Structure formats: C-alpha cells, structure tokens
Amino acid sequence: MSAVIEARHLSKRAGRAKLLDGVGLTVAAGEMVAIIGPNGAGKSTLLRLLSGDLRPSQGEVWLKQRDIGSYTPRELAARRAMLSQHINVTFPFTVEEIVLMGAGDRSAREAGRLVDAALDEVGLAHFRERQLPTLSGGEQQRAHFARVLVQLACGEAEHGPGLLLLDEPTSSLDLRHQIDLVEAARRRAGTGTAVIAILHDLNLAIRFADRLVVLSGGKLAADGPRTEVVTRETIRDIFEIDAVVHQADGVPYVLPQSMRAAASAARI
C-alpha cells in the first residue's frame, strides 16, 4: 500500500527545550499505528506535526505525496481529520450541530445521512438535540469523534484514503466506549484509512494496532509489529516498570508485576 503520511527527520524545539529529535515515520493506507510512551515523550507534539497544525524546527512532513505545508486549510481538512486531546466545550451547539460541522459544504441530504450514521456508530443518536455542554466528558468526546468521522468520510469520497489522527481519544471514556472507539478506528483502517492514535492503555494499543511506535525523551525508541516491540525489556526501559508479557491467541498483553502479585495473593 502507498504511504499516506511520511515524516522525515522531524525535530521540534521550544526555546532551549527539544520536544522532538529526529523522528521519522511512514504510515500506509489501511495501516493502524499506535504511538506509546511515557508522559513528556513527545507524542502529542509528533501528532500535531503530522496534522500540519504545528511546523517542525527541522525535517518535513509529506501527506499524500505532497509537503503538508503546501496545503490550504480547506485542502488539508479534506485529507486528514484529527480528534484533539483538549476540546473547547463552551459553545452552545447541539450534538447534531457539532457533528454536522464535519460535513462542510455537502448537500443537506448527504450531510444528514453521514451525521445519522456517525451518531449511530458512537451511540449518541438519542442525544442529537442535547446541548454539548450538558453532556458528560465522555459523551462530548464521542460527539467530537462523530464529527471527525463525518469529516473523514467527506474527504475520502473525493480524495481517496485519508489520515485519521487521534490524540488520547479514550481519556474520558469508560471501558466499553474505549473499546467501541478504537474498534471504530480499526474499521476505518480496514477500508483504507491510515490511522495514527496516541493510546495510554498499552494493552488496548497492542490489541488493535498493526504497529507500535515508541517515543522516549523526544526520540524514536522503537517502531515495529507488536510481537517485536512488546518485550519485558522494552516495558522496563521505557516505562520504568517491571512487567510480564503474556500471549493470548497470538496477541501479547502486559501485566505489571505488582498486579500479578496482587492477583496471586487473591487466589490464596
């Protein structure tokens, strides 16, 4: 599959601080990549650079074989959609109005169809007339995810496989809706979208991503299939915890030693 997004030697400084240092990354159409790493590793900085919202101090980003800086805001919105970690919820729009913002200049009929489908997918169809600030944090997150799905669908209808960026999309969600959201992202990868998600739940990242990209101290520490990246040594070196890596149906999962000891004690 052809590359949808390619980052070359990306570095970003803020004053004297180096937030990102020489990171390279390529993600193909139909591939889902999870970015993992400790707090302050540069994950959100990398995602903002890949989105075009932030310009690198060094290096370049190519989106669909074109320098991302050469796109107009309208052109960029048609080729990549991003769910940010921090979302302004003070504006008094309804859920339906928020999701409709992703449809751009689509006809009322087409926009309505896309909005209905997205609200059904995130489980908010019954809240469509509710004011966004009256919802819980998790419900607001799902409403904005529905908007992003509509934006992505509109762009891909015109320009082919696009880029879906998710910055800690599950941070406000309960376990069920965490899984629902990541499964929805996984479905988009199945239809050709390139998906890049920052996920703090390591086992969720392992379960759904094709590749894991590990950042540490602003540098690329590892990039590869989950079976190669998820080792006891990597977990210890990057996250500074002692953990055991198990396998279930060929998929690794991580259990910190403290949890393992607690589980063993509970069985005694």
From Swiss-Prot:
A Pfam short name: ABC_tran
Q: Where in the cell is it found?
A: Cell inner membrane
Signal sequence segment: none
Ranges of residues in domain ABC transporter: 5-242
Ribosomal protein as a keyword of this entry, yes or no, is: no
> Sorted alphabetically, which InterPro entries does this protein's record hold?
AAA+_ATPase, ABC_transporter-like_ATP-bd, P-loop_NTPase
Q: Which UniProt keywords apply?
A: ATP-binding, Cell inner membrane, Cell membrane, Membrane, Nucleotide-binding, Translocase, Transport
Write down the CDD domains for this protein, in alphabetical order.
ABC_Iron-Siderophores_B12_Hemin
What membrane topology term does the record carry? Peripheral membrane protein
Quick one: which residues bind ATP?
A: 37-44
* Family, as annotated: Belongs to the ABC transporter superfamily. Heme (hemin) importer (TC 3.A.1.14.5) family.
| Subunit structure, as described in the record | The complex is composed of two ATP-binding proteins (HmuV), two transmembrane proteins (HmuU) and a solute-binding protein (HmuT).
Q: What is this protein called?
A: Hemin import ATP-binding protein HmuV
Q: Which organism is it from?
A: Bradyrhizobium diazoefficiens (strain JCM 10833 / BCRC 13528 / IAM 13628 / NBRC 14792 / USDA 110)
